[in-house]
A protein has these predicted regions:
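Glycine-rich phosphate/diphosphate-binding loop of Rossmann-like nucleotide-binding domains
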Residues: 5-58, 62
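Electropositive, gly/pro-rich neighborhoods at or near active sites that engage anionic ligands
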Residues: 1-3
Length: 186
């Protein structure tokens, strides 16, 4: 029986030392610190640091330039993340288009996990680019956490891996949710 489950669980050390978070803004105002603070909390669990804050206008050209700069300044083992000021709702939206404009590619758009379904995963100059869904502004568990945990350990994440996360992917009423959603019966 032991042979049947060999390899079912594997512990892998964190290989990333640092992550870069690029935020976009819709107006001239800098976005609230809520999203960055939530990501600092997530990265602290892994002993990782977050690079200094980078906020750019929510435009493809501006974000593409910031992505190119981040790729030039980031070791290949580290992670680039994008948190947009407006929801990334399709593969042609500003953030995925900026990854392509910067010379990268989008490997997966969307995931069958809620919250977190508007995530995208890309690659730029050999580095992963994680497009964070809006729910990443909250410290509550979401689908981006499942992808982040693998990426920071240097585990390649494929489109098929993300698709497989749909089994058990409804995270709405997890025990750690600070305020449970109301049910229709109430």
């Amino acid at each position: 029986a032991t042979q049947d489950v060999a390899g079912a669980i594997r512990l892998v050390p964190v290989t990333c030392a640092r992550a870069t978070l690029i935020e976009t803004r819709i107006s001239a105002e800098t976005p609230p610190d809520k999203g960055r603070a939530a990501m600092v909390g997530r990265l602290d669990r892994f002993g990782m640091a977050l690079a200094p804050r980078k906020v750019v206008p929510h435009r493809e050209a501006d974000l593409a330039a910031a992505l190119r700069d981040a790729a030039a300044q980031t070791p290949r083992s580290d992670l680039i993340m994008v948190l947009t000021g407006s929801a990334t709702s399709d593969p042609l939206d500003v953030a995925p288009a900026a990854v392509r404009a910067a010379g990268g590619k989008v490997l997966r758009f969307g995931m069958p996990v809620d919250p977190g379904n508007l995530l995208f995963l890309g690659e730029l100059s050999g580095r992963p680019v994680l497009g964070l869904p809006g729910c990443a502004r909250s410290p509550a568990l979401n689908g981006a956490d499942w992808v982040l945990e693998r990426l920071v350990c240097g585990i390649d994440v494929s489109s098929a891996d993300i698709a497989a996360m749909g089994v058990g992917g409804l995270l709405k009423e997890i025990p750690t949710r600070p305020r449970p959603r109301r049910s229709d019966a109430q």
